[in-house]
Curated annotation (Swiss-Prot):
Transmembrane domains' residue ranges: 8-28, 32-52, 66-86, 94-114, 118-138, 158-178, 383-403, 406-426, 447-467, 475-495, 541-561
SUPFAM superfamilies registered for this protein in UniProt: TrkA C-terminal domain-like
Topology class, membrane: Multi-pass membrane protein
Species lineage: Bacteria, Pseudomonadati, Pseudomonadota, Gammaproteobacteria, Enterobacterales
Native organism: Yersinia enterocolitica serotype O:8 / biotype 1B (strain NCTC 13174 / 8081)
GO biological process: potassium ion transport
Identification of the protein by name: Putative transport protein YE1478
GO CC terms of this entry: plasma membrane
């Protein structure tokens, strides 16, 4: 049996789509030295190549892909979006605005200088900033514009070409910039990280290991009673001195949970809960009492839960204010905008932060009720909320403003982004509403992006040869300028106008570029996870601003041309 592959693919849009995705994802796994191409650029390159062979895809698939991606970006940004405006939030907002604004101005200027159309200009901006939200925002606005001006169809095709030509330039230049720019300024990054750590009392260890607490039981001997010297448990401060706390006491055969007034007596059997290294450092007075195996003493269900910060008595407060150890709980991680933060008593909590806490199930539940709620451990998505807010986003996108003879529509990208932010924010405040498992959210977001990339590549591939020869060199130079110059501008603005600590500043700059690989390099250079504070500060707001920038550059383009 003879199978004509070309006819088979052209006659089956779904098959063509998944062939493009599979080949593109394979290509995206290739590495050029330390640089991995990535899924987005892999799918785009394959779709451009197949597009040259006149393979096409239904445009509705492209539209659905970008809609899912943008909506998920909003959902992820929602929990921490509004907290950006507190504490250092003003600085982070201004840095993100400077980064996105300067990049957009440079792209517009270079586009006019070289005589490009808006498709190449917006694509170059998206690729240089390694930002798919820019590409998606520009693509959505262009589609609405093309409906009124079919002559712009070529600009739509050029959008993916500009992105493909400049993406690697943007990624490689930023990674090299992250490695070498900190060395060109006069302040040492590790010193800056230690300085902010001293000012805020933060732990600078970027390689902190996390263990689950364990429980062991001991019989109280004379040495331990002598060490206690008649003090009750509150006066002794067992946790401060040992890193463990006493969960239970058996005295005269009676098992009880002790309060702070309890005094240790010879013959008591106590269960101690703490991290393994805390047990190993116990004062000899504890270990000299015989370790015992008592099923009831050791029968404690230690759980690890993710607690979402919500309540006013925790938001804006330092970790020390929670006094987790006084409640017999252990903090393993602090996560903000999917970024792991430094763990220290002086870290200030934002609404939507996630605390990973271990301890007795009853104690963890009690702590969760005081500071927020335990994140749902479910694989079931609240599809009703997902669909309802998706519809709301599409309805918002239909809103149009009329100014004299000029009309401006919000568009699907901005509408879905706003609806996603609302859903994410409400989810962070209401534990049973709008739950989407992180794995499901990541899958929908990634799949939507890949479908969008496949669509724009197949649509543009037919005209790539004619455009590539004319603008290839200009694109590479422009991509380098738009990638690095805004980083330098942000550094000057942050260092000399905002006077930010350099470790926080470089982390914030990488967050404004939403580039995790560059952030890893900054943390390695600083030998600290302090820069993650800055990265988390700008990351959420930058994703939103970059999407809006993609739409805005298309809207203002006619005015730039004069």
């Amino acid at each position: 049996m003879n199978i004509n592959v070309a006819n088979l693919l052209n006659g089956n849009y779904i098959l063509l789509l998944f062939v493009v995705l599979a080949l593109g994802l394979c290509l995206g796994k290739l590495r050029l030295g330390p640089i991995q191409l990535g899924n987005a650029i892999g799918v785009l390159v394959v779709s451009l190549l197949l597009g040259q062979q006149h393979f096409t895809i239904n445009t509705e698939a492209l539209n659905l892909g970008f809609m899912l991606f943008i909506f998920c970006v909003g959902v992820e940004a929602g929990p921490n979006f509004f907290s950006i405006f507190f504490r250092d939030g003003k600085n982070y907002l201004m840095l993100a605005l400077v980064m996105v604004g300067s990049a957009m101005v440079l792209a517009l200027g270079l586009g006019k200088l070289f005589g490009w159309d808006i498709g190449l200009t917006a694509g170059m901006l998206a690729g240089s900033m390694t930002s798919t939200p820019v590409l998606v925002g520009a693509g959505d606005t262009l589609r609405h514009t093309i409906a009124n001006n079919p002559a712009l169809q070529h600009a739509q095709d050029n959008l993916s070409l500009g992105y493909a030509l400049t993406y690697l330039i943007g990624l490689v230049s930023l990674i090299l910039g992250a490695r070498y720019l900190p060395k060109l300024q006069h302040q040492d990054l590790p010193t800056s990280a230690q300085q902010i750590a001293r000012e805020r009392g933060l732990d600078t260890d970027s390689q902190r290991k996390v263990y689950l607490p364990v429980i062991r039981a001991y019989r109280v001997g004379p040495e331990l009673v002598a060490w206690a010297d008649g003090k009750n448990l509150r006066e002794l401060g067992i946790y401060r001195q040992t890193g463990c706390y006493i969960e239970r006491i058996r005295r005269n055969g009676i098992l009880a949970n002790p309060d702070g007034d309890a005094v240790l007596q010879v013959g008591d059997e106590i269960s101690l809960v703490g991290y393994p290294d805390a047990h190993s450092r116990l004062d000899p007075s504890f270990r000299n009492g015989k370790e015992v195996f008592d099923r009831d003493l050791l029968d404690m269900r230690i759980v690890t839960e993710e607690i979402v910060v919500k309540n006013s008595n925790a938001v804006g407060k330092r970790l020390s204010h929670l006094k987790l150890t006084d409640h017999g709980c252990f903090l393993n991680r602090v996560i903000r905008s999917q970024i792991e933060m430094p763990i220290d008593d002086n870290v200030v909590l934002n609404k939507g932060d996630v605390l990973q806490v271990s301890g007795d199930a009853r104690r963890v539940k009690s702590v969760a009720e005081k500071i927020g709620f335990i994140s749902i451990h479910s694989q079931v998505t609240d599809l009703l909320a997902f669909c309802a807010f998706f519809i709301l986003g599409l309805m918002i996108g239909l809103i149009t403003f009329q100014f004299s003879n000029f009309s401006f529509g919000i568009g699907n990208a901005a509408g879905l982004l706003m609806a996603g932010i609302m859903l994410g924010f409400l989810r962070a405040n209401h534990p049973t509403f709008g739950y989407i498992p992180q794995g499901a959210l990541n899958m929908v977001k990634e799949f939507g992006l890949m479908v969008f990339m496949a669509g724009v590549g197949l649509s543009a591939g037919g005209g790539i040869n004619s455009s590539l020869g004319a603008v290839g060199g200009q694109m590479l130079i422009s991509g380098l300028i738009v990638s690095l110059v805004p980083v330098v501008i942000c550094f000057i603005f942050g260092a000399y106008v905002l006077r930010m600590n350099r470790a926080l500043l470089f982390g914030a700059i990488m967050g404004a570029r939403t580039c995790a690989p560059a952030m890893d390099i900054i943390s390695d250079t600083a030998r600290s996870n302090i820069p993650a504070l800055g990265y988390a500060g700008t990351y959420a707001i930058a994703n939103v601003l970059l999407t809006l920038a993609g739409s805005l550059i298309v809207i203002v383009w006619p005015g730039i041309l004069g």
